[in-house]
Swiss-Prot record:
Annotated InterPro entries: ATPase_NBD, ManNAc_kinase_bac, ROK, ROK_cs
Coiled coil segments of this chain: none
Pathway annotation from the record: Amino-sugar metabolism; N-acetylneuraminate degradation; D-fructose 6-phosphate from N-acetylneuraminate: step 2/5
Catalytic activity: an N-acyl-D-mannosamine + ATP = an N-acyl-D-mannosamine 6-phosphate + ADP + H(+)
Pfam families listed in its UniProt record: ROK
Role played: Catalyzes the phosphorylation of N-acetylmannosamine (ManNAc) to ManNAc-6-P.
Gene Ontology terms describing biological process: N-acetylneuraminate catabolic process
GO molecular function per UniProt: ATP binding; N-acylmannosamine kinase activity; zinc ion binding
Residues that hold Zn(2+) according to the record: H156, C166, C168, C173
Chain sites annotated for binding ATP: 5-12, 132-139
Assembly mode: Homodimer.
PROSITE patterns: ROK (PS01125)
Stated name of the protein: N-acetylmannosamine kinase
Length: 291
């Protein structure tokens, strides 16, 4: 059975056909609509899936935000155009006439990345550092989503009580500091208004402020990982996302994690499926019908 997998992120929408063998084909991307309206997202999703839907028997969605009862609740509305209570499952069922499931994108990615690990690992955490910071937890060989879909939203844990206000409404969240948006927001002077990709480029060219911003992000993530080790005793942490997979970033995180007491050290791995983990994880979960 072929799954039409969809990944809804803060900057892009992706879709692909995924067979029972896990092979990804006919992958397509569109920018996430800048307009803060449900109709804009519906129209973009329609354009994305229309060339693919005839070749699939079901739909699996991985989306940023909390997924509850098939609807999207954007914990940080800034990451998805201010959408709240968007009926993801209902919308895709109407567009495709196919049975549909939905799950948080980082939770989906965690499940895909777990499948790529050695068989003796039963407990792992996936962290995505991209437009925002998200995560997924596998414990005892099972994906933990929680009764309300909140499990794994580790980007909204405290990093600095005196830090910037996060889009979720809390102060000093990891996401507000370590994410691509957090890096860009903190930029000043000639870097003001630059996005995270530009800041990474400037850091590689020796720009001191850019390097400091990236170190701040990596240090914040390392402290989060130490906290995760303390709370889950996971065997490894897998890091993905456009920031997490940026050249040199994971090595910086490892350097800062090494400064923590040894009890909080844990193996860090780069995401095996890189930017396709959400798509694949959603398809795998649809195959297992575990949602």
């Amino acid at each position: 059975m072929t799954t039409l997998a969809i990944d809804i992120g803060g900057t892009k929408l992706a879709a692909a056909l995924i067979g029972a063998d896990g092979q990804i084909r006919d992958r397509r991307e569109l920018p996430t609509p800048a307009s803060q309206t449900p109709q804009a997202l519906r129209d973009a999703l329609s354009a994305l899936v229309s060339p693919l839907q005839a070749h699939a028997q079901r739909v699996a969605i991985a989306s940023t935000g909390i997924i509850r009862d098939g609807s999207l609740l954007a914990l940080n509305p800034h990451n998805l155009g201010g959408l709240l209570h968007f009926p993801l499952v209902k919308t895709l069922e109407q567009l495709t006439n196919l049975p549909t499931i939905a799950i948080n994108d980082a939770q989906a990615a965690a499940w895909a990345e777990y499948q790529a690990l050695d068989g003796d690992i039963t407990d792992m955490v996936f962290i995505t550092v991209s437009t925002g910071v998200g995560g997924g937890v596998v414990s005892g060989g099972k994906l933990r989503t929680g009764p309300g879909g909140l499990a794994g939203h580790i980007g909204h844990t405290l990093a600095d009580p005196h830090g910037p206000v996060c889009g979720c409404g809390r102060t000093g969240c990891v996401e507000a500091i370590a994410s691509g948006r957090g890096i860009a927001t903190a930029a000043q002077g000639e870097l003001a208004g630059a996005n995270a990709k530009t800041i990474f480029t400037r850091a590689g060219q020796g720009d001191e402020q850019a390097q400091q911003l990236i170190h701040r992000s990596a240090r914040t993530l390392a402290r989060l990982i130490a906290d995760i080790k303390a709370t889950t005793d996971c065997q490894c942490v897998v890091v993905g996302g456009s920031v997490g997979l940026a050249e040199g970033y994971l090595a910086l995180v490892e350097t800062y994690l090494a400064q923590e007491p040894a009890a909080f050290h844990v193996d860090l791995l780069a995401a095996h499926y890189r930017h396709d983990a959400g798509l694949l994880g959603a398809a795998l979960l649809a195959q297992g019908e575990k949602l």
